[in-house]
Amino acid sequence: MNLHVVFALAGTEYALPVGAVLQMETFAGATLVPGAPSYVAGIVTVRGLVVPVIDLRVRFGLPPAELTLDTRIIVTESSGRVVALRVDSAREVLKLDVEKHQPAPTVISERASGFVHAVHALGNRLLLLVDLPQILGETKHDQLPQLLADDGSKARPQLPS
């Protein structure tokens, strides 16, 4: 049994292992970053650290949504990088039996660009288990790793002494 954070996007429930989650909080907005990919909603400060926010609706090819009182960011860490995921809501942590995970049908994994790696049936609910490294572009060529890796060293030589 592993703990998972359950979150929703456009009425569909997804799950992410708790081990990848640092914290969850209400999302009130982010500072926009010029030139960032469309799925990067901007940056926020979390515990004194500037963190990029990925709008999972846009990343998954869904239409963007307005902010509501339920909108959350799930602050995650993968391969030493901290990233916040904007979701419609996140209110539940569940114990899921890993033995009951089923591979995502090909049509789902292809349509979801590999972001979903398994499905978990929980009573009459189906939870789509997300692949965080895939979302963060760690397993395919993507602009996001470069954005996350930039520590400001490129800009420093341009700053006046």
Task: Please provide the spans of the model-predicted regions.
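An acidic, low-aromatic, low-complexity terminal/linker signal
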Residues: 1-161
